[in-house]
Amino acid sequence: MASIQRVTARQILDSRGTPTVEVDVTTGEGVLGRAAVPSGASTGAYEAVELRDGDADRYHGQGVLRAVGHVNDAVADALHGMSVLEQVAIDDTLRALDGTEDKSNLGANAILGASLAAAKAGAATLGVPLYRHLGRATARTLPVPLMNILNGGEHADNNVDMQEFMIAPAGADSFSEALRTGAEVFHTLASVLQDRDYSTAVGDEGGFAPDLGSNEEAVELILDAIEKAGYTAGSDVFVALDPAAAEMVEDEAYVFWKSDPDTERSSEDMVEYWAEWVDRYPILSIEDAMDEDDWDGWAMLTDAIGDEVQLVGDDLFVTNTKRLTRGVEEGCGNSILIKPNQIGTLTETLNAIETAHTHGFTAIISHRSGETEDTTIADLAVATGTGQIKTGSASRSDRVAKYNQLLRIEEQLGATAHYPRLDAFPLTN
């Protein structure tokens, strides 16, 4: 039966030195599943609740001993004796135990740790990789990496408003070739920045975080790096953006706090702004181009450019099927970012992906800015066949760990491995 014998949690540190939760699920046969939970910096208002201790004398209030205690007590008791092969039942039990819509009782960090650790124990029990356990025999699609090589916004201490400037090597023939392309462009960008006496210090997600003359200069630098690396922008490598617009809003106006704090922009202004960027640059995808509460603005944006570029809802949808369904009904966006800790269980995460695909939306598996060495999202991307992943730049071991896991999976799949190229972005075809 592979029943759960023991569930234990501990407090560990994430990539920012901030405490997070790690959970072990052990079966009666001694099989172990272990998962560590990430944490975001720019979090959506509608995400599941991450439980923190609030004790100013420990980790400046950011400790997670309360969440750890919930796992070691209530969660351990509730899951004892359950089969690790019954993921839906496990997650239903966790949700019922918490009893809230936003996981605010036990904490999404406690619940997700247990959920993912159980899934890993299930895979280990069957003697198969996690991607095979979750995706069955048909799982063979490697994701196009959206590599965050220039950081701004909440992810960097610089004067760049946009949070992420990414490259998508969608012209490569395989995942390993795509990763090589991304790494080469990343290292070339370092040289481009150095030539202009810009800093090559990196932000939370491994991308460079220099002070620049404008947001536009960030894109121009990336295009220069693509060319100098020997690739062609718009066919080999594309640009993707995450402005994180929710961080730019005050009193229903959009303000570029770092570069232009005295100018207020309306939703209509932002739609015009992004349409102009899409016309000017080889942009494949824009995430969180509008605020999480600006449903009308999202609809306007989707109507304006939604037939030519991927418009991704992160803070808008927060991996939540209810918010995603509203977005579908109101014509807001055409893609969803998938972050398991936004919703709190693996089953709910999988349901969000299924809902997206049912309605013709793309889905992108994503890390958080505060990461660990846990590689679950790499397996999740292959298991669900989303065809896209966001897991940072080609630096920082917490980011590269996911890429290395995808390389291993590609090797395991051998000739059956599929790299979707531009097919992962149907609007571009």
Curated annotation (Swiss-Prot):
Positions of (2R)-2-phosphoglycerate binding: Q163, K339, R368, S369, K390
Comment on bound cofactor: Binds a second Mg(2+) ion via substrate during catalysis.
Pathway info: Carbohydrate degradation; glycolysis; pyruvate from D-glyceraldehyde 3-phosphate: step 4/5
Cofactor(s), names only, from the UniProt record: Mg(2+)
GO molecular function, one term: magnesium ion binding
Keyword Cell wall biogenesis/degradation: no
Location of this chain's protein in the cell: Cytoplasm; Secreted; Cell surface
Keyword Membrane: no
Chief location bin: cytoplasm
GO terms, biological process: glycolytic process
Keywords per UniProt: Cytoplasm, Glycolysis, Lyase, Magnesium, Metal-binding, Secreted
Binding of Mg(2+), residues: D242, E287, D314
EC number: 4.2.1.11
GO cellular component, as recorded: cell surface; extracellular region; phosphopyruvate hydratase complex
Signal peptide: none
Active-site residue numbers: E205, K339
Reaction equations catalysed: (2R)-2-phosphoglycerate = phosphoenolpyruvate + H2O
Function: Catalyzes the reversible conversion of 2-phosphoglycerate (2-PG) into phosphoenolpyruvate (PEP). It is essential for the degradation of carbohydrates via glycolysis.
Family as reported in the entry's similarity comment: Belongs to the enolase family.
Protein name listed in UniProt: Enolase
Organism listed in the record: Salinibacter ruber (strain DSM 13855 / M31)
